[in-house]
Swiss-Prot record:
This is Dihydroorotate dehydrogenase (quinone). Its main location: membrane. Belongs to the dihydroorotate dehydrogenase family. Type 2 subfamily. It comes from Herminiimonas arsenicoxydans. The gene is pyrD. One of its GO terms (biological process) is 'de novo' UMP biosynthetic process. It holds the Pfam family DHO_dh. The active site is at S182 (nucleophile).
Amino acid sequence: MSEKFLYALARPFLFAIDPEAAHNLTLHALRRAASLGWTSAIAKPAHDPRTVMGITFPNPVGLAAGLDKDGAYIDGLATLGFGFIEVGTVTPHAQPGNPLPRMFRLPQANAIINRMGFNNGGVDAFVSNVQASRFYQNKEGILGLNIGKNADTPIERAVDDYLICLEKVYPYASYVTVNISSPNTKNLRQLQGASELDALLAQLKEAQQRLADQHQRYVPIALKIAPDIDTEQIQTIAQALLRHKMDGVIATNTTINREAVKNMKHAEEAGGLSGAPVFASSNAVIRALKAELGDALPIIGVGGILSGTDAQAKIAAGASLVQLYTGLIYRGPALIRECAAALRAPT
């Protein structure tokens, strides 16, 4: 029985209940199925290796951060055929995130609005979950760990939170993502400004070099940016990434723009909009970044991928790898295999 058929059966039920409840139910079911060995034959990662940031990825289709914020479901997610998995965003201390409800479906737009607010159990619990996963213990694949700042940390001290998290997740990560682009943590996107970004990247790079010496292993750091930036901001970010010799950039996070979903139910809800409406703006940022960075720094493309053709468009815009999230909600895990097939390198 194919994952496409199974998801077609499950989707009407999942879409009939609260989006966050459906999210949690799906993850629990996947973890349970994996623990019982029921998922072992669902999907092996397609073999289409790509070397990016010095890492060889089994294939170029990954899971974006946000689905598994606490790293509690890694083994279940690893059965779906991803070339890499990114978990988080995690913060130094546990926090509940924003009040419920905080996730909304816009099915006519193949979109989601969320204002989760980095809800997570804190970095110590996160690291324990990663360590406990078979995926980590058996070195089964590529694991990205995504870090952020606590909501009650003043923006002027944000770098402290990133450094705390980097120190703790570094030994367990294939790569680390620095999330400065969620619209759901007050003032977070200020860190994309020239002086703020310079200060942040300088200290992250210094810590990375120290940790590489300490652990005898270099772990790449990628920066995750927003789609709601203009050409000048893109140039500023690109120059800072090059100046500080960062390892990669993930483009993009969710958008605060509502033009594409105007007058739809839930369109006025606060939060970040993901899915099909962010596809074009994300691609525009990727193209502009590619023009600035050339081949000096790889781009991981995320935002609005709902088909293999969409994944191809991200690569054509300048990305080296792609990530999925909202597309999985609307298309199910068959989307992973479809994207991997569409991106398969010619033999």
